[in-house]
Amino acid sequence: MRIEHHSRLTQSAARRVVLGLCLVWTLFQIYTASAIPFVLSDWFGLNIVFNNQEVRQIHLAFAMALAMLIHPLRAADHSSIPWVDWIAATIAAGCCLYLLVFKDQISGRSGLPVTADLWVSGIGLLMLGLALFRALGLPLLVVSSIFLLYVFFGDQPFLPDSMQWKGASLNKALWHFWMQTEGVFGVALGVASSMIFLFVLFGALLERAGAGLYFIQLAYSLLGHMRGGPAKAAVVASGLSGIYSGSSIANVVSTGTFTIPLMKQTGFTAEKAGAVEVAASTNGQLTPPVMGAAAFLIAEFTGVSYTDLIRHALLPALVSYIGLMYIVHLEAVKLGLQGMPRSSRALPWLQRYTSLLAGFFGVALLGGLIHLSFGWIKGVAPEFSIWLGLLVFVALYVFTLLLASRHPDVETLDSPESFQTVMPAHEILPRGLHFLVPIAVLLWCILIERLSPTLSAFWGTLAILTVILTQSALKQWFRGHAFQWALLRRGWDQAISGMIQGAQNMVGIGVATAVAGIIIGTVSLTGAHQVIGELVEALSGGSLIAMLVLVALMSLILGMGLPTTANYIVVSSLMAPVIVSLGAQSGLFVPLVAVHLFVFYFGILADDTPPVGLAAFAASAISQGDPIRTGIQGFTYDIRTAILPFLFIFNTELLLIDVTWVKGVTIFVVAAAAMMLFAAATQGFWLTRLRLWETGALLVIAFTLVRPGYWIDQIQPPWLPQSINETVLTEPTYAGTLQLVFEGPDFDDIDRDVRYVVLTTIPEGTDVTTFLESQGLIVQVDAETVSLEEPFPGTNYFQDLQRFDFYGDRPVALTALSVRN
C-alpha cells in the first residue's frame, strides 16, 4: 500500500494501524468542526467539547506520529516500519499530549517551568524537526534551524551590531516555543487544525469521487480541438483543480499525467509541455477559494474576512489565467500547431452559444429562487431552514445524478490513450454535474450564508461523502438495474479511502505549520523582521521599486522547496512587515491584504524557479524533459504572474478594494487586455513576430492600461507641497487629505535620521491640530520648526513612531506637508 509520495510500503499489520490512525484523525477533525460535541454534552452531560488549544495539541500529535510511521528515515526501511519509528511516533505524540493532560498544572505555573516541562519541550522540538525532515526534507528544517540558532546566539559578538539582540535563555526559549501559544502551538497550527484540514479533506474526497478526472475531460472537450488544445485544456483543468487542491506538485501530477503527453503529441517540446503544466498548476495555488490551503492563514494574519479575501484574490487569479491561456495560444501559433481531431461533428456555433447562455441564466435563476426561498423561510420559520437546505441538496443531487446516469461513467475515459479524439462538450458535461453540487454547497455556505470557513467545509464534506457513498449504486438503479448493495459497499470503501487520503495529505501541512510557528515565535521574540527591514532598506538605497524587487527576490528564495502553507508563513512573517514599514517611510500606504498577497505570489512562484522548483521536477518526470530547462521555461511563462503583485501594490483596485461592481467589471476587462498585451510582448509575437520597438510599445500600452494614473501624475502631481507653519496655523479648519513627513533621530542609532510618512484625512469642520492630537500626533509649533512629541500608548501611531528617539538633543520634526491635488 503506497501511502503517499516518498512514503513507505508497510506490512499488513502495521498498515492497518497506520490507516486506522489516519481515519481516527479525520473523524476527530470532523467531530470538532461540527455541533456534535455540544449536542452530546447537552444530552449526556459529559464534557466532550475540545477548545482550540486542545484541538491543536491533538492535531499535532496525529501529524507527528503519522510522519514517523509513514515516511522512512532510510531507504532500507521502505517496506516496513522498524520498532525505532514506533517509539519515535509514541514520544512525539506524547510530547503534544503532555500539554493536554497537564493543562491545569501548566497554566498554574505560567512562565515558571518545572524540569518535566523543559524536558518535554526540548524533546518535542527535536521530534518535530525529525518529523519535518521525514515528511518534507531539508529546506524548511534548515530555515527553522537558522531561526532557532538566532534565538540562542543572537547576542554573540561575531554578528554585526545591527543583527544582535539580547538573546534568550534555554528555559525562556523552550517555554516560548512549546508551552504557550506564540510558538509551535500558535496561530498557524490553529488555522491548520480548524480550517485547512477540512478543506484538504474536501479536496481528497472530490478527487476520490472522480471530480479531478471529470474536470480534465470537460476542459479537454471544450478546448482540445483548438490550436494547442491540450495545453489550453491543461490551463483550465489546473485552474479547476486549484479550487480544491492544496499543492502545485499534486496538481501537476494529477492533471499533467493526461495533458503533458497530449501536448507533446500535438507538437510541444517536452520542456514546453512540462512548463505549461507547471505554470498552470502554480497559478492554481493562487486561485480562490482554497489558494493552496493558505487562504485561511492570509485571512487570519491580515484580519480580513475569508469572504473578502476571496473577492480580493479572484480578479488577479483570473487575469493571470487569461494571460497564460493567451501565451499558450501564441506558442501554438508560432509553432504552427493544430488541435486534436473531434470524435464527431460539432454542434452549430449558434446552438452551442444559445445552450451556454440558457444554462447560465437557468443556473442564475435557480440560485436566485433558492436564495429568496431561504430568506423567506428564515423570516417565517427559521427552524425549518436547515430542512429546506437538505431538500434542495437532495433534489439537485438526484437531478444531476439522473442526467449522469444517461451517459457513460467518467471512469470510462481514464487514460491518455482515451483522449486521442475530442468528444463534444455536451456529452461530457452531464457525466459529472453531480460533482459540482458539493462545491456549490461549500461556496453557498461561505458566500451566501456567510458561515465560517470551518462550518462551510464541514457541510461541503458531508455533501461530497454523500456523493461518494451513493453515486455508483444510484446511477445503476436509475439505469433500470436492480439496486446493488455491493456498489453501496464500494462507495463506503471509497469514502473511507478518501478520508484516509485526506489525513495523509495533511501530515506534511500539519508538521509544516507547526514548524512555521517557530519562525513566527522567533520574529515575535527577537524582532528579526526589523533586521531584515534594515538590510533591505540599506540595499535598496531608499528606492521604493528597488525595495519591492528585493522583497520579491527574497520571497522567491525563502519559498524554494516549501509547501504552500509553510511557504506563505515564512515569507509573510519576514517580508510583509518590511513592505509595510519601508513603504510607510516612502509614503506608500497599501492595505495589509495587498502586502500579504504580494509576498504570497512570489513565494508560490518558487515552485517553478530553478534550481529547486519542485513542480518543474514533477512535470519533467512526466514529460521526460530536462527539469532545469522546464523550470526556466515555466518561469518565463509566469513572468506575467510576477508582474501582477507590483501592479496591485500601486493600484489596489485590481484587488476590488472599495470599487462598485460596474467599476469591477471595467477593471477586469482592462486588466485582462493589458495582461494579453504583456503576454504578447514577452513572447515576441502578436499576429506576427514583433520588432523590438513593437515589443516596447506593447509594454507601454499594457502598463498604461493598468496604471493610467502614472502618466497623469507626471503632468499633474498628486500632492501639492504646503508651507508647514502657514497650513497648520492659518488654516486650522482645512478639510482634505494631508501627507505629513516626520524626520528625527533613530531610536537605535541617534546619529542616524529616520523618516516616517503619515497619510491622514481631516474631516470637514474639524480643527487640524485637534484632529491630529486625537490620532496621537501632538505637534509643537515654534518660530522655525514644527516638532512632534512622543505619542501616548494606545493611540494610532504609537507603535509606528517608536522608531524615533523623542528625548535626544535633536527633535522629531515635521519636515514636509502636502495636500492631495
Indicate where each model-derived feature is located.
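Hydrophobic mid-bilayer segments of alpha-helices in multi-pass membrane transport proteins
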Residues: V18-C22, E54-L69, V84-A93, V120-M127, ...
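Hydrophobic transmembrane alpha-helices
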Residues: F202-L205, L240-S241, T282-T287, A512, ...
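Long, contiguous bundles of hydrophobic transmembrane helices that form the permeation core
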Residues: M1-A13, C22, R311-Q504, F617-Q722
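Conserved, well-structured core domains of diverse proteins
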Residues: M1-G108, L118-G122, G323, A702, ...
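Core transmembrane alpha-helical segments of multi-pass membrane transporters/permeases
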Residues: L130, R134-A135, S145-F147, G154-P160, ...
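Low-complexity, proline/glycine-enriched hydrophobic segments characteristic of transmembrane helices
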Residues: V363-I386, Q585-L588, Y710-N821
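Membrane-interfacial loop-to-helix junctions in multi-pass transporters
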Residues: T115-W119, E182-M195, L222-A234, T266-K272, ...
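Hydrophobic transmembrane alpha-helices that form the pore/transport pathway of multi-pass ion
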Residues: I216-G284, V290-L297, G303, T564-F602, ...
